[in-house]
Amino acid sequence: MAVERTLSIIKPDAVAKNVIGEILTRFEKAGLSVVAAKMVQLSEREAGGFYAEHKERPFFKDLVSFMTSGPVVVQVLEGEGAIAKNRELMGATDPKKAEPGTIRADFAVSIDENAVHGSDSEASAAREIAYFFAATEVCARIR
């Protein structure tokens, strides 16, 4: 399996619950390295641009409102099969359908406030990482 990078966002609901460290620990215990990270308060423009592919969906306005309701932690994770591994750790989008022990099963309350975001493909990972980080902000982890 190839070493990949993926974007992960700890959403406002999880930040407010003060579980950032617990979520990051799960990534690291699963063999993923954090190679870039920052806490940001997204503007409506930034959140809308990030989720532009959903612009015509009925939930778009609520999604943007939620993502701007408090700070988020945005990070780049790196590791073998990072995209699939991160999605497995997150669990199903709807926390009621998420496997026990996944991030969403443990920390999310609804399909709307579901604790985390993760890239779903190599193409989306590349696009999403570039949306939040300059190449110089992503640090190779060689030790």
Swiss-Prot record:
Reactions performed catalytically: a 2'-deoxyribonucleoside 5'-diphosphate + ATP = a 2'-deoxyribonucleoside 5'-triphosphate + ADP; a ribonucleoside 5'-diphosphate + ATP = a ribonucleoside 5'-triphosphate + ADP
Name recorded for this polypeptide: Nucleoside diphosphate kinase
Stated role: Major role in the synthesis of nucleoside triphosphates other than ATP. The ATP gamma phosphate is transferred to the NDP beta phosphate via a ping-pong mechanism, using a phosphorylated active-site intermediate.
Cofactor: Mg(2+)
Subcellular location: Cytoplasm
Record gene name: ndk
SMART domains: NDK (SM00562)
Assembly and oligomerization: Homotetramer.
EC number: 2.7.4.6
GO aspect biological process, one term: GTP biosynthetic process
Any one Gene Ontology molecular-function term assigned to this protein's record: nucleoside diphosphate kinase activity
UniProt cross-references to PANTHER family, sorted A to Z: NUCLEOSIDE DIPHOSPHATE KINASE, NUCLEOSIDE DIPHOSPHATE KINASE DDB_G0292928-RELATED
Phylogenetic lineage: Bacteria, Pseudomonadati, Pseudomonadota, Gammaproteobacteria, Pseudomonadales
Family: Belongs to the NDK family.
Domain of life: Bacteria
InterPro entries the UniProt entry points to: NDK-like_dom, NDK-like_dom_sf, Nucleoside_diP_kinase, Nucleoside_diP_kinase_AS
GO cellular component: cytoplasm
UniProt keywords, alphabetically: ATP-binding, Cytoplasm, Kinase, Magnesium, Metal-binding, Nucleotide metabolism, Nucleotide-binding, Phosphoprotein, Transferase
Gene3D superfamilies (alphabetical): Nucleoside diphosphate kinase-like domain
Keyword Methyltransferase: no
Enzyme class: transferase
Active site: H117
One Pfam short name: NDK
Residues involved in ATP binding: K11, F59, R87, T93, R104, N114
Organism: Azotobacter vinelandii (strain DJ / ATCC BAA-1303)
